[in-house]
Every structure is written in structure tokens, then in C-alpha cells.
Amino acid sequence: MASKYSVTLAAEDGYSAAFRGFAEAAEQMQENIRGHQAELRELNRLGRQMDGYQSLQGDLAATAAALDDAREKQARLSREMREAEEPSRRLQNEYDKATATVAGLSAEHRSQSNELDRLQGSLEEAGVDLSRFADEQRRIEEATRQTNSVLEDQRARMQAVSDAQARVTAAEGRVAANREARSQLRGEMVETLALGYLASRPMNSAMDMETSMADVAKVISFAEGEREQYANANLRLASDRLIASSGIRGTDIADIQYAAGQSGIFNEMEGQERFDGVMEFTRQAAIMAAAFDVSAGDAGSAMVSWRQGMNLDGDQALQLADATNHLGNNFNTTAADLTELLVRQGSVATTAGLSAEQAAALGAAFLNPGTQREVAATGFKNFILRINQGAATTDKRREQWNALGFEPEELARRMQVEAPTVIREVLQAIRAAPADEQSAITETLFGTESIGAISPLLVNLDAVDKAFNEVSDTARYSGSMLREAEGVADTSRTTWNVXTAEVARLVTQVGNGMLPVFEAVAPPVTAVIGYMADFTEANTELVGALAAGAAGLVAVKAAVLGVRYASLLIGQVGNQGALMRARLDQRTAQTALAADGAVGRLNAAINRLGGGAAGGGRNQRGNGSAAAGAAGAAGAAGAAGAAGAAGAAGAASRAAPGVQNGWRAWAANVGNSRAGQVAGKVALPVALTAGAIGVANAVGGGDAADVGSTAGGLVGGMGGFGGLMRQQMALGEEFVFSLGSGFPYSSLQRRSDGGWIEIDITYASPSSQNTGQALEQIRLSGTAFYAAGMQRLDELRAMQSERRPYVLVDGLGNNLGRWKIMSVEEQQTRVIDDGTAMKVAWVLQLEEFVDDAASSDDDSG
């Protein structure tokens, strides 16, 4: 198809150039008319001269006759005078009068003779054969009539050009009107899409909230109406300034409730009591998320882990959150990192004898040097566990503990009573050892993976004392998290977030009212779209894309607008076609005028050369007619398209019959070869493009013969290309894969196996061995629809049962050889109540057929 587009673009460029040259062609035509008018005036002048010449000849003849009569009378009177010897006065007077008359007539005769000679010279210069004056006079009259006829034809051509221009203007007006209509329709589409978007926003918000609460319902058994109660409370909670500062939405708050429900903390509660407990937990976790700059889901999970892992109630968890926030503000760490460490190892610390706040303090000390969270958490765990190991301590560690002055059992006991003191003493004892032994002691007691977390503590034991001191008094950190959240909430961004949350609540409530309507409208629309999607999937060559619009009335309006827009596009195609035809008519009229003008100028030039011999003049005029005939014949050949090209080839072969058997036979051999076929397909779009450019150039030059020949070649080439494009894949003579036959294929896979295998060799690389090229395989697949396509499947099976090979020809007319039908597979779907399958996916497996005994030219099948 790419070649076809190239030709079309070139042709359109030619028409555009023709339209732009309309003014120049009209001006040239006016110039031609002025030339013909000048020639007509010249012919009229010659006619008047010939009329004067003929009249003067008559006057000259009358003058000569009168002169003869006067001379005869003079002679007679002279004789009478001589006879009378004494002429009378009367006779003398008459004689004098006759003499004067003779003198006057002689002068007039000389004048008329001179004028006659001048006219004869002028006419001879104009090519008038005075030896055949009557014929020349008739020729001039005929030329004058023909010139007048040409002028009338030119006026008609001018009118045709004007009509063509009017059609072009009308077509352009229709194009502009269509464009304006499509622009207006696009505006309606944008408006509809905007309405659809505005309508979808509430439904999307409502569906998002509905989905989030459906997840919560998996872990909390809601009674009737409770899901909506929780959802509404979440939307209101999202607009709380302490929570809105972090941009938490109602769906995010549902993640906190999911964590609470999954933990089972509120499973023993029912109704309003559970609602109050869950919402209080949710509010605390949401404030924690805003203060700690973590997600709502992570804050909820952390709260649950603290309460379950460290056996805390709600107030204790809130107190731990305050301590964590306070430590994060006073140490080189963040509340979020410390929260994660406590989620991982908080239960280990409280089991070993630390309170939740003391565990947070020790965690802050481990994180303070900038230690990574994972390393600090590992060192924290190993440090607490090994100190609290007691009698389970290994001999090697016991020996090391004794060297430091500790008994493992005593350490474990004291940890349950005075854990911070024991931790300080252990760290001080390790620090008191020689510097080169501290790492070895740490590795022996707590493991290699703990060195990176414990060694920084030995350098700065004051940080440990400071951490424990920060949580020793509740007054120091109580309410720290709430104050942090209030500080973040006191910003314009929070005000904006509150307004956004309220708008989201309104939009969600509107969407809740729209969802029942959507649920009623969506199923039938979805069923139709599903069938269209199946059809699109099976007919990708016909359908480019299928888009579903919004639900309800918006979807219906979008569909109507789509149909209207498509009809306008189709109408625009018609308008463009009319515009192209009008421009072509205009260019055709201009070409005809140019051709007529060229022929007229040729005849006039030949006629002006007619001053020579009569025979020569006729020969030259005959040649002019032949030229005109040649131009007309060329134009006819151009209109005939390929026939003109064929006629030219035939003329060439007749002109040189000896050459025909040479180059034509050679060309036939090359054209029938494989290389010739490939070259022909490659050269076809190039030739069509060149032909379109040639037509445009010929039209611009005004050469009728050139226009006819180039246009004929182009039309013939396009006809050949159209014939090529009409070919379709066929298997044998019976079966064609096409839309028209109800059985198109959607994909073709061709496999060629080179026959290489690898042979394993002991203690060496494998060896490649070629066992001979395997037979090629082709796999065709597509979708057949009820009921014509299923009949074609039966035809394929009937061909398979004949157990013979078939010739396969592709869509470009290439013979792919003979192939065996190995299998015909089908899968029936969309089965309706009576068992009829509305859709059948099929696969045809072909394998190359090789018969050494058969002739290579045998393509039957």
C-alpha cells in the first residue's frame, strides 16, 4: 500500500500546480486570441486589397476600352479631316477633346497599372498565387471562416475554463463548509468528552472508595449499613487539618482500617463500640502518618505491630509514638526510621526487659551515628539477645563475659530489673578493653554482623546515656507527635488540602448516587462492546481500533457524534474528489486550448511560408495537418491509457520488424525471470510517480502530444497496479483466502529448518552436524464467523481428504510451490443456546511437498 500512497501524493501535487497555473494559462490564452485577431485583421486587409485589385482590374479594362474607342475615334476624325482638308471648328474641338481624353486616360492607365503592380507584389509577398486568383480568394475566405471558428472555439474553451473554475470554487466551498462542520462537531465532541470526564470523576471517586472499603470488609465483618458508615467517616476524617496536612485521602484512611481489622484488635467489639474504637485508632495512625511523613498504610501497620508485638494498649502505643517523634527530633535519625526499627525489633527489646520507650531510646542511639536501618536493626537485636541469653550462653561467649567481669545469668536477671544500667555497664566494659581487642570482643559476644552497629556506640557512649535520659521523664515527650502534626497543619498547603478533601467528599457522595444508574446501564453496553471487541480481534485488517465511551447518556451521545463525524469525513472525501475532478476538467480545457493554439500557430506559420510554388505550399500545409493529426492521435492515446502505450510499442515493432525478434525476445526473457518480477514490483511505484510528474510537466508545457503519451502511460501503469493489488492468496484452484469469500486469514507463519544438530563429545565442545534441510512449514490462522466461514472449513477438510498437494500463491501473485495439508484445527466459541458457534478460530498447517520425479513446471492442483 505504501506505493499507492506515493502515486496519489504525486498526482495531487500535479493538480495543485495546475490550479495555481490557471491565471497564467488564461493569460496565455488571451495572448493567443490577440494573435488570432491580428491574423484576422491581416486577412481582412488582404481581402480588401484583393477586392480593390479586382475592382481596379475592371476599371483598368474599362479605361483601356475607352482609350481604344478614343483612339479609334481620333483616327476616324483624322481620316475625316484629311478627307475634308479643311476641318471645321467643330471637328477641331472634338479632336482636341479626344486628344485630352486620351492623355487623361493614359495617365489613369499608368496609375492603375502601377497600383496593380503594387497590389500584385503585396499579394505575392502574402503568399497569394495570382495565377489561381479564384482559388486563392476562396482559400482566404475559408481561412477567414476557420479563424472565426477558432475564435468561437476559444471563446467556448474560455467558458469551459470559467465553468471549471466555478466548479473548483464550489468544491472548495463545500470543502470549507465540511471543514467548518467537522470543526463544530469536534467542539461538540470535546464538550461531550468534558461532560463525560466530569461525569466519570464522581463515579471514579465513588468506585475507588467502594473498592477500598471492600478490602476492609475482608477483615472486618460489617453489618448492614456499616460499610457506608465507615466510608463516610473516612471522608470526613480526611478533611481534619491534622490529617489533611499530609494529603491523606479517604481511600488511604481505609488502608489503616484494613491493618486494624487484619490484626484482630477490635474483633471482640460490636456495633458502635467497635466503630468508636476503630475510628480512634484510625485517627491516631493518620496523625502519626502526617507527623512522621509516612503513608497511612505504613502508619497503621506500625501501630498494629507495636500494640501486638510489644503488648501495648491504645494509650501506650500513642505514648510510644510521642517518644519516637521526640527522639527523632533530638537525634541524627528520623521518626520514620526509628518506627521501622521498633516494628522489626521492638518485641525483642520489651521481652528482654526494656520498656517500649527505652527500646525506642536504644534504637535512636543505634541509628544516631548514621548507621543504616538494616544494620542498626540487626545489631540492636543481637545486642539485646546476647545480653539476655543467660544459661544458654555458649562456652566461648561465657569465657568472654567472664573476662569482662560479667556472669551471663546475672546479666539476664538484671536486664529484667535495670536494663538501661546493664546496657551502659556492658558498653563501658568493652570500651575499657584495649582498642585493638574491642572488635574481637564485639564479634565474639554479638557476631560479626553486629560490629558495624555496636562499634559506633563505643565511640560515643554519651549518646546512649542521652537517649535513655530523654525518655526517663514522660513530660519531656508527651504530646510530641500531636505538636508535630499541628506545626505541619499550620500552613496554606493544609488549607488547600482541607478544601480538596471536602470537594472529594462531595464528589464521592455524588458518585455514590450515580453508581446505581451505571450498574443498570453498563451490562448491556458491555455485552455489545465485548462482541465488537471479539469481531475486532478477529478482523484486525478491517478495524483499527475500538474505543468505548463513558457510560449511560454520555456513551450514547459520543456514539452519535462519532457517526456524524464519520459521515462528514466520508462527505469530505467526496468533496475532495469533486475538487480534483473540477481541477482536472480545468487542466484538460487548458491543455486543449494550448493544443489548439499550437496547431493554429503551426498552420499560420506554414501558410505564411506559402509564397513559394503552389505544390510546395500544399505540401507544407499537408505537413501541418499531419502534425495536428499526430497531436490528436497522441491525445487519444493518452486518453486510452495503457492502450496508447501498447499502440506505441506496436508502432515501434512495425517500424523495425528486424529488431523485434531481438530486443523484444530478450525483454520477454528478462521480464519472466525471477529477477525481472522482483524488479518490476520495485520499479512499479517509481514508474507511477515519475509518470505523474511527467504529466504535470507536459501540461505545464502545453504540448498535447506529450500530455497524451505521459497520461496514457500513467493510466496504464495504474491499471496494472490495480490488477496486481486485486490478487489474493489462494490454495490450489478451489480455495481463496479473502474477505469476499468469508474466510480471511489474520496471520501467516513460515518456518524453515536448516537441519543442524549438535553431537555431544566427551571432554570436548559439541560438534555441529547437518542432516539435510527439513521441509518448510506454513501455519495460517484466522477467525471464521457464522455461517459462511464454517462452510469454508468443510471445504478445506474436503481438500485434505483428497491427499494431494496444492499450489500456494500469495497475495502478490508469487508461486510458493506445492504444499500438503497436514492439519485443519478449529476452536468454537461464543456458543449460543442451540449449540451454534458464532465464532470459530481456525489453524491450517501446511508442509512443503517434494516430488523429485515430478516436473518442476508442474503447478497443477
UniProtKB/Swiss-Prot annotation:
> Which residues lie in coiled coils?
20-127
Looking up Pfam families in the UniProt record yields: Phage_P2_GpU, PhageMin_Tail
Q: Which GO terms describe its biological process?
A: viral tail assembly
Record's keyword terms, sorted: Coiled coil, Viral release from host cell, Viral tail assembly
For this protein, the record's InterPro entries field holds:
Myoviridae_GpU, Phage_tape_meas
NCBIfam families named among the record's database cross-references = tape_meas_TP901 (TIGR01760)
- Please give the family membership noted in the entry: Belongs to the P2likevirus tape measure protein family.
Q: Which PANTHER family match?
A: FELS-2 PROPHAGE PROTEIN (PTHR37813:SF1)
Q: What does this protein do?
A: Serves as a base for tail tube protein polymerization and acts as a template for tail length determination.
Q: What is this protein called?
A: Probable tape measure protein
